[in-house]
Amino acid sequence: VVLRLYLCLSVILLSSCAINGKWQNEPTNELAQVNSLVIKDLALVGQAEKKPTVAVYPTAFKDDTGQRRGNSSFATFSTAVTQAPHIYLIRALQHSGFFHVVERTGLDNLTKERQIIRSTRENFEEQKPLKPLLFAGLLMEGSVVGYESNVKSGGYGARYLGIGSSKEYRQDTVIVSLRTVSVSTGRILLEVLVTKTILSVAVSQDVFRFVASDTELVEVENGMTENESVNLALQAAIETAVLQTIKEGHDLKYWSIKDE
């Protein structure tokens, strides 16, 4: 009896080794980290001969999908996509080093502070003028135009003599549109559409056996589910859109890259 029990436990232990190595350890608390660009090529794109000045308004780059976070147990009002996607766009533009990005998200606060500075200088008779705000020659607009759940799902498994193993997966997709608009003419200079897959994978093993003359039941389960972060997938899609915008703008001679 002991031997049979030992064999059952040994099989489930060995089968669990099929799970990805990074899943073998239980998750632990980690320190906060400073996020880097997901698309490394964006940081290596090079410098523009003359950096274009661009602006991103919060209302000009938002989630247009209205997609709710999936839940099979109860209704949820949480959205599947962040309601501040413009933050990722601003970050991608800024960290690429290719553009001058002007502040438009907190424009009201910026204007108020400038008014306070002017008022203070007038009261203390300081006539030094305040530098004018930098205006943008280009507007970066667009949105998250699509989020589709369960685009593809499937899996496989096997069971023999009460010992089983299975793997399941599911794919969602997020679609991002990015436009580059000339402020002077209102003309759309560039338009990019990017689709990113979001993958979820579940792996499990189990043992279901009767021991001790079929009077005692042994049941062991082991498994792990990994869901790709929607925010990281969205960040990757937006960074890819910015990278493609830089490449297409260069091909159309809207800007040039140093040391070419």
Question: Where do the PLM segments sit?
Answer:
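"Short basic amphipathic alpha-helical interaction patches in structured regions
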Residues: 72-73, 154-162
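N-terminal segment of the mature soluble domain
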Residues: 52-150, 173-191
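C-terminal/domain-edge helix-coil "capping" segments
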Residues: 18-52, 148, 155-157, 168-260
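Positively charged n-region of N-terminal signal peptides that target proteins for export
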Residues: 1-5
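Bacterial N-terminal signal peptides
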Residues: 6-16
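Extracellular loop and loop/strand-boundary signature of outer-membrane beta-barrel proteins
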Residues: 127-128, 162-166
